[in-house]
Amino acid sequence: VTACTSASSAGTVTVVDRPDTHAVNANYMGYRAPLRPLNFIKLPVGSIRPEGWVRKFLELQRDGLTGHLGEISAWLEKDDNAWLTTGGDHGWEEVPYWLKGYSSLAYILNDPEMIEETKYWIEGVFASCQPDGYFGPVNERNGKRELWAQMIMLWCLQSYYEYSQDRRVIDLMTNYFKWQMTVPDDRLLEDFWENSRGGDNIISIYWLYSHTGDAFLLELAEKIHRNTADWTQSTSLPNWHNVNIAQCFREPATYYMQTGDSAMLKASYNVHRLIRRTFGQVPGGMFGADENARLGYIDPRQGVETCGLVEQMASDEIMLRMTGDP
């Protein structure tokens, strides 16, 4: 990273290995103490207006499948949708996955029709709130509430808050996290996907804590961490699913932002190296995993899922924000 100094020393360039985090950014919100400071702060969605070829490519995305998926996808059918109707039978996972990108595209392009469509779904989320703090579809497996879809929707709500400053987001997240505090450990994050991906829940907890300073949130983050799959193993992984690995290797580093325990940070780097040491043969920097990484299938003919690629990109960006490491 290079940084130009003040006008009094114009022409001088200082090279640093990572940004200085001692000063507090007065313009944009980072992590609230005692969380470790972020090295890079994500700008609120919509604060940068694209021009030129970047805008053109975003418009192509709007005019293509992303912008029109609701017209053709059964999962986004509004009648009896799980995010719009109590007991709805479809869309519990697919809606927030799509909305996460669709809504950000709407805000960045400031597209009125897309913003209105986004608002329709967001209002459905608010309408789903229950008195105990839970929100969204009720999806139970073996009598235990499954929370993976909520983890995705929480990210949609954060983007909506950045765009709108709608206080209902803060209230919903606060009430939902209070509900999570009431769930016994033996009934929390027991399903495969949510158990692997608890780190996404922690990121949302830290986002809310940085806005409100509610102390119980740090206690909840510890609870989520201890009930999430163990991504700190030195020579193995909790599972070998490509999306889980790309998405979840950052969980220990995320928790490091609270504990300051360097072993947590090293664990994330270890997973990154471990999977690539054996399976890192896919052009472009990914590891080979046709759904799962499999011993014996380690050559460049192996593929990887598109969703594994995008989760790796997201993880790399989040890791950069947290660590400052290039």
Question: Model-derived features: where do they sit?
Answer:
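Glycan-recognition and catalytic cores of secretory/periplasmic carbohydrate-active enzymes
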Residues: 10-326
